[in-house]
């Protein structure tokens, strides 16, 4: 039976011009096997028909309410939804995603059975007809599944779990008692980071289950993660998180380095995402922020890999030098690697060294070879560090197997080129050369 005063789960759906996806999203919520829910659609005055669609749903199902936001801010919309929610737990569904029919029944069942403030599950990423299962916990943390934890018991929840909020439910008392709110910056950019960090910092009981319910879209061309114009959003969000820690001195000493770690991951992602004309200015902000973090002794090098630390020190020391030496070819590198098997083969050290060997056509070039070889190997190692850092924080960006590329057969032919064969032989037996 539906309890209209206190439903089991209040589901907030912030929306703005989501007409292509909104019906699939709302239908998946209304069809939940858990019927005792309320749906709060917080629309920021959509102009593409989304608002009209939501109002039609509101007429047909009294569990759904449409609330108009006077600000186009994801954080403001979410805060409005949290304020209006009457439920025991909070759920979130983004307006371009959808969920499996048993999601909230299962999460609520686990939450009640284990008396948990937070329950999160695995999820799916889908794009262009392909779907991938993603674990909320990384391999090194899989032993945390099906146990009540918090960061005091196991700091790995901050290091090895996915920060996506809609894949879970959250006891509303936790948010209200601790006055947890999202940053109300304009648009939709990174505000979910602050919500995740606050919840994980303050929750006493978090539970992860090895089941997936949430369908996360990655082919929406209007998604904020694809915007090349939003430059400083990550900076503003991690300043917001750092201000939160200042208000909680009992958390600050331990969690400030965690904040710095995630700031780094998001800054690196921003560097890859934003338009070329903004990169140098962003690197200057990157340098400024991490110089302060280092000065305040808030950076725990044990949380970072050697490559990560070299990147940080390079940017802090000279952001302009980092930009001119590395960023130009790194942008080209990522574009080529993700869209061609042939480029993947040409990126390999065997091919690159082989090409240097083939170009040795006169005594001057032979004399220059050791220096060129040193630079090529140095560049290759740095590119590998950039790639490893990216997939460390965004595992879904890991390169697919070569055979999945459309030019796979052409790539195999490149392996038979003299340049590749020579380079491979050089790597295996450099003394012979």
Task: Describe these PLM feature segments.
Residues 51-84:
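Conserved donor nucleotide-binding strand/loop of the catalytic core
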Residues 27-36:
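Short, acidic, metal-binding catalytic loop of nucleotide-sugar glycosyltransferases
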Residues 74, 78, 98-210, 214-231:
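Donor-binding/catalytic cores of nucleotide-activated saccharide
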Residues 211-220, 225-251, 266-298, 359:
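Catalytic core of nucleotide-sugar-dependent glycosyltransferases
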Residues 43-52, 94:
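A conserved acidic beta->alpha catalytic loop
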Residues 116, 276-344, 412-414, 421, ...:
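Membrane-interface aromatic/basic loop that binds lipid-linked glycans or pyrophosphate carriers
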Residues 1-28:
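N-proximal low-complexity "stem/linker" segments adjacent to membrane-targeting elements
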Residues 90:
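Short aromatic/hydrophobic "clamp" motif used to bind/position activated sugar donors
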